[in-house]
């Protein structure tokens, strides 16, 4: 492959064997595409805002005299950009303006005659916008809307697994789930009657629904049963014979084919052989005894023709008496229902007998009573309720997905249809359910991903927006009906508040709108690709069973089987697989390569879980020859969710990649195939907790996925267009764009402003550093600047550490780690944490608070770090308790003593009226002030510091725009010069005059003069545009801020804290091998090898075998080989060997193994080879993709190239004694992460502090500055030791004896170390509780 200039700087050697047929899809597309569908105008009106508007509008008045129609909508421009919103603490959103048309009809004229039409654009609130990185900025904080995996609308058939009834009988049920509306359930009871429930209420016989749909008993029976006719001849019955229907019956008489030839004797069971013989004999009639018809059911009602009296109702059971009666009434043919024990049950027939209703009205009344118990039913109310349940599009919608699923399940040919149910739909559900009960068909697997779909941001926002619109609709309808429409405009009808409230509620406080996990780029990407089964309309932790949480065969390639949280949410929160995407219906799809007659093509099809089951799919590692044909006769395949062996000619599809089944986080684990799944799960989860280190270090052993994550996460600055870097400093990069990528009349310059030392949601540091230099060429997609945890455009979550697996004085007992002091000194795991501290000046009843440096009773030293406005300087180093922002609050006037009044009169001292309420640094925090932001209310005078900050921001904006303008000017003057030279002016004339006079020259040629004037006009327009741009920015910066009521000023101070690695910090590898640092040992005491190189970390070898994460050992060996190769290249560079030797060695390294990667070092220039070698000095970075990684043989080859022992084990010497250890030790390089569980955040001690109000016991937890609970078991321990006084102290003065503890505090101050324990407050609480039971206990204080 061809590498760009930037990519040639450092090439990661790839051990992957299988050819990559497709790039990884953009990792955030699930979020961005969904939201784009929501806000883009959809001409079909099926999705997004358009669909919401069309579903509610037009809104008609109750009288029909007017209606409000929807025309179109547009989203305005957001007021502030993303960064400004984050700084100001506001929502990044755009105003929604909707064009509405009010149509008033003429009451007097014919129906539909329009009297008046008014059209107007109406403001309908703000719609939060998604940033380019798939997040939302809500009230200044970045949030992510997690996609939800919910049960797809449609119809589902299931059974209770025999758990409902004591007999263990399996009871089948069907459930019609709409996208919105009432649920309709059908279920069998233990007696095999069919019942219906609406919205899980009381059950009714299922026939009631059919009666309510105007079906009679006869029609119902005709729909569900075939009939068998019997002709009465005297005292004999002749049956119309269909041989198939006799299967399984026991003959109660001899069945003969011909005279004397008995086929089935009486008492024998009729088998398939008998039926074949009957069919062969073509017997159409069979004489049966009268007993044979007894117990059968009539399919229709029979009437006595002479009297008109009903002899037998439809569904009546035939008895001998009834038979005689019917025969007597002259009925010669009786039609009975065909039923048998095996495949046609008597369920509907039995249900009709249970049903008390006989006509439509009775059925509707029953439904009404069930839905609205206690309300008296009327005919209209009952009919209205029933038709609104399933047959009104306003109340009920299956959605396109639901209709497609419904039709496919009940066997309808079409995939499309209406969103409401029809009579036929309800009948087909009942027929399918009865079929399943009869053994025809299977129940559904609700955990199959064909029955669960993804609801993403756009869809959820649309639903919420529709909820807001429905609230508005009611108000509009009432307003329209009030009359006086002549003076009313659409604006007067619409109140945007309910819409804004619904949208705000969803984005601000929905369970699926989550505070973004911003620890590092991986945690951001993973959070956006998360799929939750929880949330509104989903499952709850308590109700979810094992099946829902389990890995399902359909997860393959769609949902990661590894990455899920440990704990109560296991299996309910999942992560999208690398290549998965959602289709138009919201079902997850995964890509497959098409295979035709054993030949693997490059054609790629995306299949959903529903479609996949029908195909035979081979795995990505199936052996193929050079012509891409499958080699083996039998190939390992998946078919109908089972793993089987199939002939290569039968294979229809093949996986696109071995990494297809896992998520992004799991695909970052090298040698994943050698790790136990539980540990891989921990590894995936812990990578998300890694804190970005101060000095980034790319992993030596990676998987090739690092680059994809770093670029797609959006933390790096990526070139939008190709060009040449014309300017670089720490905070901005300017790229002069290639001419072929420029648009007509534009600047041809891209400015990238980098994010510097910004606080993330998790208080970690977001900082971008340029990786390009001036004059370097860039192509589109190149990384220009690294973000947090990225190194030259690759994800770098931790550091490559030299580790040894050996015990060391018990310091690595039970997963502890021993660390070398060198790691701390070199700042390898030093991290920066930024805290935001806020000081708010409010308007109080006693007067307004003031931010000032004039604080009462505070010494000069405490104010030394504040400026004259009372705000701390940037760059000041502060400790716990230091004042950051001086603030005074007025306090209520106290009654003064005469002496104080006199002093006040003499000295005029007023300072006593205010109290110090300054913002101070929290205890145990020490850091540097890196930024201050001041927000002042409109109309409040700005202080000197606020003005200074404003000036600085304006200067930056000016510089940006000035750079862009100067480059544009240069381009325009270059074009002008070319034109003037071609018009005959010479170069010396042009250089002697100022450039702005070039544009005012008079040229002889009219065409050239016109062109010059056009250039001059273009130049004036550009200047004007820039002035406008600057004015807009200036207004934004200088305008007052929109603060909450009562707030005058807000000062935000950003404090950077450096955290060095220390004992108690948690660290981990990528294989779930986590541990806590037990000790940091001087470097001279660490074990070292024969070259005197000490190890950085000593790990316990016993942590490996039982955990079965062998991947870490392979990573250690491979890391060592990579490091060895880097050292060899370093030696060659230092010895200044010939370039061809260096080139050959590097080529030899890249040629190791049978990988898909081709690196032609021969085609590199000498400078490029030297640059590459310089970047390989620290070690050769390699990629070993999951399930497709480096083999043992290849690792050994690298060891040989690096001149190292192939065992990967080395003889180490003890740094303390100087003696060699007995056995060689596994030493190598492992990528270690420092997790965001730092001892500084956990360590906490309390002497005195706040107490709980009722029990008066100290609070718990660091956040509340609480104490350590001395619990029940600790009390037992002291009791066991007989330490009575210690126990008394613990239970009284150190806990909730209020008087005792106050007295002890006084005594300690006085130097008196005695205590006087009293009655603990909890004892008083106990007394009060006993009194509440009516038992009085009094204490005698003798």
Swiss-Prot record:
As one GO molecular function, the record gives:
DNA binding
The UniProt keyword set, sorted, is: DNA-directed RNA polymerase, Nucleotidyltransferase, Transcription, Transferase
* Source organism, top-level taxon: Bacteria
Q: Name one GO cellular component term.
A: DNA-directed RNA polymerase complex
Q: What EC identifiers does the entry list?
A: 2.7.7.6
> What does it catalyze?
RNA(n) + a ribonucleoside 5'-triphosphate = RNA(n+1) + diphosphate
Give the UniProt record's GO annotations in the biological process aspect: DNA-templated transcription
InterPro entries associated with the record: DNA-dir_RNA_pol_bsu_ext_1_sf, DNA-dir_RNA_pol_bsu_external_1, DNA-dir_RNA_pol_su2, DNA-dir_RNAP_su2_dom, DNA-dir_RNAP_su2_hyb_sf, RNA_pol_bsu_bac, RNA_pol_bsu_CS, RNA_pol_bsu_protrusion
Sum up the protein's function in the record's words: DNA-dependent RNA polymerase catalyzes the transcription of DNA into RNA using the four ribonucleoside triphosphates as substrates.
Q: Which family does it belong to?
A: Belongs to the RNA polymerase beta chain family.
Note the subunit structure.
Answer: The RNAP catalytic core consists of 2 alpha, 1 beta, 1 beta' and 1 omega subunit. When a sigma factor is associated with the core the holoenzyme is formed, which can initiate transcription.
Q: What is this protein called?
A: DNA-directed RNA polymerase subunit beta
What is the protein's species of origin?
Colwellia psychrerythraea (strain 34H / ATCC BAA-681) (Vibrio psychroerythus)
The encoding gene is rpoB
């Amino acid at each position: 492959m061809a590498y760009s200039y930037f990519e040639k700087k450092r090439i990661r050697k790839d051990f992957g064997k299988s050819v990559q047929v497709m790039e990884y899809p953009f990792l955030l597309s699930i979020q961005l595409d969904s939201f784009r569908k929501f806000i883009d105008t959809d001409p079909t009106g099926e999705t997004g805002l358009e669909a919401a508007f069309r579903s509610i509008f037009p809104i008609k008045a109750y009288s029909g005299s007017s209606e409000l129609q929807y025309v179109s909508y547009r989203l305005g421009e957001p007021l502030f950009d993303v960064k400004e919103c984050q700084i100001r603490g506001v929502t990044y959103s755009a105003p929604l303006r909707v064009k509405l048309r009010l149509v008033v009809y003429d009451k007097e004229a014919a129906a539909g005659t329009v009297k008046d039409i008014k059209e107007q654009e109406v403001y309908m609130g703000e719609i939060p916008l998604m940033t380019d990185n798939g997040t939302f900025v809500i009230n200044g904080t970045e949030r992510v809307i997690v996609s939800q995996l919910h049960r797809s609308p449609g119809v589902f058939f299931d059974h209770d697994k025999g758990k409902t009834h004591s007999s263990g009988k399996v009871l089948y049920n069907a459930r019609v789930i709409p996208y919105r509306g009432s649920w309709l359930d059908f279920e069998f009871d233990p007696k095999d009657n069919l019942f219906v429930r609406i919205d899980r209420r009381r059950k009714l016989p299922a026939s009631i629904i059919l009666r309510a749909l105007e079906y009679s008993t006869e029609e119902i029976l005709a729909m569900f049963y075939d009939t068998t006719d019997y002709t009465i001849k005297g005292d004999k019955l002749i049956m119309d014979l269909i041989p198939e229907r006799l299967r399984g019956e026991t003959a109660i008489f001899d069945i003969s084919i011909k005279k004397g030839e008995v086929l089935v004797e009486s008492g024998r069971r009729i088998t398939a052989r008998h039926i074949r013989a009957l069919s062969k004999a073509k017997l159409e009639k069979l004489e049966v005894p009268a007993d044979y018809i007894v117990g059968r059911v009539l399919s229709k009602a029979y009437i006595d023709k002479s009297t008109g009296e009903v002899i037998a109702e439809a569904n009546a059971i035939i008895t001998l008496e009834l038979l005689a009666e019917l025969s007597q009434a002259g009925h010669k043919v009786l039609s009975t229902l065909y039923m048998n024990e095996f495949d046609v049950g008597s369920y509907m027939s039995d249900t009709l007998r249970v049903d008390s209703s006989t006509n439509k009205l009775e059925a509707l009344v029953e439904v009404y009573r069930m839905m609205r118990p206690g309300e008296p039913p009327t005919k209209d109310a009952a009919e209205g309720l029933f038709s609104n349940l399933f047959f009104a599009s306003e109340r009920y919608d299956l959605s396109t997905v639901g209709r497609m699923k419904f039709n496919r399940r009940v066997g309808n040919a079409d995939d499309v249809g209406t969103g409401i149910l029809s009579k036929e739909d309800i009948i087909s559900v009942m027929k399918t359910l009865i079929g399943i009960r009869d053994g025809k068909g299977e129940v559904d697997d609700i955990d199959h991903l064909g029955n669960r779909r993804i609801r993403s941001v756009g869809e959820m926002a649309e639903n919420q927006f529709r909820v807001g619109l429905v609230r508005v609709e009611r108000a509009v309808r009432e307003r329209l009906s009030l009359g006086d429409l002549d003076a009313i405009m659409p604006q007067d009808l619409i109140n945007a508040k309910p819409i804004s409230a619904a949208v705000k509620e969803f984005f601000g406080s929905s369970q699926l709108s989550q505070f973004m996990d911003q620890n590092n780029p991986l945690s951001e990407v993973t959070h956006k690709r998360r799929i939750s089964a929880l949330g509104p309309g989903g499952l709850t932790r308590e109700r979810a069973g094992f099946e829902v949480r389990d890995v399902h065969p359909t997860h393959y390639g769609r949902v990661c089987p590894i990455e899920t949280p440990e704990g109560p949410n296991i299996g309910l929160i999942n992560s999208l697989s690398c290549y998965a995407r959602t289709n138009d219906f919201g079902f997850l799809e995964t890509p497959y390569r098409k295979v035709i007659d054993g030949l693997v093509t490059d054609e790629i099809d995306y299949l959903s879980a529903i479609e996949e089951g029908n195909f035979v799919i081979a795995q990505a590692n199936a052996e193929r020859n050079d012509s891409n044909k499958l080699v083996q006769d039998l190939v390992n395949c998946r078919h109908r969710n089972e793993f089987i062996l199939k002939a290569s000619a039968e294979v229809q599809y093949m996986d696109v990649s071995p990494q297809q089944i896992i998520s992004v986080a799991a695909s970052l684990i090298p040698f994943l195939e050698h790790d136990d799944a539980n540990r891989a799960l921990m590894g995936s989860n812990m990578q998300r907790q890694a804190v970005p280190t101060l000095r980034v270090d790319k992993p030596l052993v990676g998987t090739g996925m690092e680059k994809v994550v770093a670029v797609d996460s959006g933390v790096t600055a990526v070139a939008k267009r190709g060009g040449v870097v014309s300017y670089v400093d720490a905070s901005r990069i300017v790229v002069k764009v290639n001419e072929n990528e420029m648009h007509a009349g534009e600047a041809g310059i891209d400015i990238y402003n980098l994010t510097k030392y910004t606080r993330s949601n998790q208080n970690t540091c977001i900082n971008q550093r340029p990786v390009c230099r001036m004059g370097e060429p860039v192509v589109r997609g190149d990384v220009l600047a690294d973000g947090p945890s990225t190194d030259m455009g690759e994800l770098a979550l931790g550091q490559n550490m030299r580790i040894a697996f050996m015990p060391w004085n018990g310091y690595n007992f039970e997963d502890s780690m021993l660390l070398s002091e060198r790691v701390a000194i070199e700042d390898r795991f030093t991290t920066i944490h930024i805290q935001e501290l806020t000081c708010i000046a409010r308007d109080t009843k006693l007067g307004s608070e003031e931010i000032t440096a004039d604080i009462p009773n505070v010494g000069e030293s405490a104010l030394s770090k504040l400026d004259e406005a009372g705000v701390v300087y940037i760059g000041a180093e502060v400790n716990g308790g230091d004042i950051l922002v001086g603030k005074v609050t007025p306090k209520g006037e106290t009654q003064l003593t005469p002496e104080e009044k006199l002093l006040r009169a003499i000295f005029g001292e007023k300072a006593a009226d205010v109290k110090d309420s300054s913002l101070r640094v929290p205890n145990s925090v020490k850091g540097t002030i890196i930024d201050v932001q001041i927000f002042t209310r409109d109309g409040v005078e700005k202080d000197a510091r606020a003005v200074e900050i404003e000036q600085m921001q304006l200067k930056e904006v000016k510089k940006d725009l000035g750079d862009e303008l100067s480059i544009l000017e240069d381009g325009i003057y270059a074009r002008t010069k070319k034109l003037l030279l071609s018009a005959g002016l010479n170069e010396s004339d042009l250089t002697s005059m100022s450039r702005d006079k070039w544009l005012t020259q008079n040229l002889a040629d009219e065409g050239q003069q016109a062109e010059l004037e056009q250039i001059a006009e273009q130049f004036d327009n550009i200047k004007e545009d820039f002035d406008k741009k600057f004015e807009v920015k200036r207004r934004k910066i200088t305008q007052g801020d929109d603060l909450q009521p009562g707030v005058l000023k807000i000062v935000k101070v950003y404090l950077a804290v450096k955290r060095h690695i220390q004992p108690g910090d948690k660290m981990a590898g990528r294989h779930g091998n986590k541990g806590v640092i037990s000790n940091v040992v001087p470097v001279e005491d660490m074990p070292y090898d024969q070259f005197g190189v000490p190890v950085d970390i000593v790990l316990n070898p016993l942590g490996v075998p039982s955990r079965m994460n062998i991947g870490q050992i392979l990573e250690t060996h491979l890391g060592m080989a990579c490091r060895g190769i880097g050292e060899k290249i370093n030696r060659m560079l230092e010895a200044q060997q010939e370039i061809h030797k260096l080139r050959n060695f590097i080529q030899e390294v890249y040629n190791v193994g049978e990988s898909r990667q081709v690196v032609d070092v021969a085609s590199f220039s000498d400078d490029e080879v030297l640059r590459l070698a310089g970047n390989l000095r620290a070690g050769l970075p390699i990629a070993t993709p999951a399930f497709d990684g480096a083999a043992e043989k290849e690792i050994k080859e690298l060891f040989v190239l690096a001149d190292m022992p192939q065992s990967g084990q080395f003889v180490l010497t003890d740094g303390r004694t100087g003696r060699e250890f007995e056995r060689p030790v596994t030493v190598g390089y492992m990528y270690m992460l420092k997790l965001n569980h730092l001892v500084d955040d956990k360590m906490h001690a309390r002497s005195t502090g706040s107490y709980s109000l009722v029990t008066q016991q100290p609070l718990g937890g660091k956040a509340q500055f609480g104490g350590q609970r001395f619990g029940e078991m600790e009390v037992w321990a002291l009791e066991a030791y007989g330490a009575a006084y210690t126990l008394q102290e613990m239970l009284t003065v150190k806990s909730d004896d209020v008087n005792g503890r106050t007295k002890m505090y006084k005594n300690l101050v006085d130097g008196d170390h005695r205590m006087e324990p009293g009655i603990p407050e909890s004892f008083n609480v106990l007394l009060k509780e006993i009194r509440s039971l009516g038992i009085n206990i009094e204490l005698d204080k003798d």
